[in-house]
Amino acid sequence: MFHFSIGTVLISICWLAQWMEAKSQRIDPDAENELWDSIKHTKVQNIVEKNAIGEINSPPTDGTPYLKVVCISDTHEQLHNVTVPDGDVLIHAGDFTNNGKREELIKFNEEMTRFPHKYKLVVAGNHELGFDHDENQGERQDADKGLGTEDGYNILTNVTYLQDKGVTIDGVTFFGSSYHPLRGFPFYRNRAEQLAECWKAVPNDTNVLITHTPPLGYLDQFGDERWGCRDLLKTVERIQPAYHIFGHVHEQHGVLSNGNTTFINAAQCNKGNQIQTRPIVFYIPKKTLS
C-alpha cells in the first residue's frame, strides 16, 4: 500500500501545472485548438445563468449603492432591432457597423442618443474599418479594401470611445481595448509577441474589462476553431477584473465564471447578422473613497 502526504500531493500538482504551462509555451501560438487543449484542464468554467430579462445577478438589498450595467456587442447595423433595458452604464463591445462607413457611424451615433443610460462606453470591433491608425490595409479582404472612415471614432460624439483607455464611474474602473488575432482587419495583432505587449496597457486595478475579442477558451469557439487570445486570458487571470465583456464570436453569446472573473460574450447577432439575443445585465457595487 502506498501512502502519500498532503505535501507530496501539493508538490505533484504544482509540478503538473508547471509542466502543462511549459508545454503550452512550445506550441505554435496560432494553433489555438492545440494550445487550449494543453491548458484547459487547469481552467475553471462555470456556466452563469441569465434570467428572462438577461440579468445574471441581483442588485444589493442592503442599501449598498450600485451601478446597473447593460452589455451589448456585434449589432452590425441592427441596433434599432435591439430592446435595450434601462441602466446606468451601457457597454457596446464592438462591431456596431458592417464596414465603418460614415453613414453607418452617423446612424449608430444617433441611435445611441435614444438610450437613457448616463454612461455609454464603446470599443471598436474588427468591422470598424478606418479606426486603427496602424492597420496594414494591404492585408484586408478584397471586399473591404477602400472602405471605412479614417478616424471615424471622432463621429461618435454621443458615447465614450475607449481604445487603450479607461474611465472611472462612481469608483468602478472600466477599461477598453480593441485588439484581436484575426488577420485582415483593423486592430489585428499577431499572437504572442504583439498581443502580449498590447495587453500590458490594461491597468491592474481594472474592475470591468471591455475588449472585442474573447480570451482563449472562454466563449470563443467558431465552428471547429478557437478565436480567443491566450495572452488576453493570461492578463485577465493576472489582474482578475470582476467582469470581462466582449463579443466577436456571434455563436457563443453567454456567460461563464472562473470564480474570480465573470466572462460575458454579449454578441447580439447570429452568423447572418440578424439580432437573435437580448442584452446581458449585471449589477456592481459602487466604490467610495475611504
From Swiss-Prot:
Signal sequence range: 1-22
Glycosylation sites: N204
Keyword terms, alphabetized: Glycoprotein, Signal
Pfam families registered for this protein in UniProt: Metallophos (PF00149)
GO molecular function: hydrolase activity
Source organism, top-level taxon: Eukaryota
Family listed: Belongs to the UPF0046 family.
Listed PANTHER family: METALLOPHOSPHOESTERASE, UPF0046 PROTEIN K07C11.7
Protein name: UPF0046 protein K07C11.7
The organism of origin for this protein: Caenorhabditis elegans
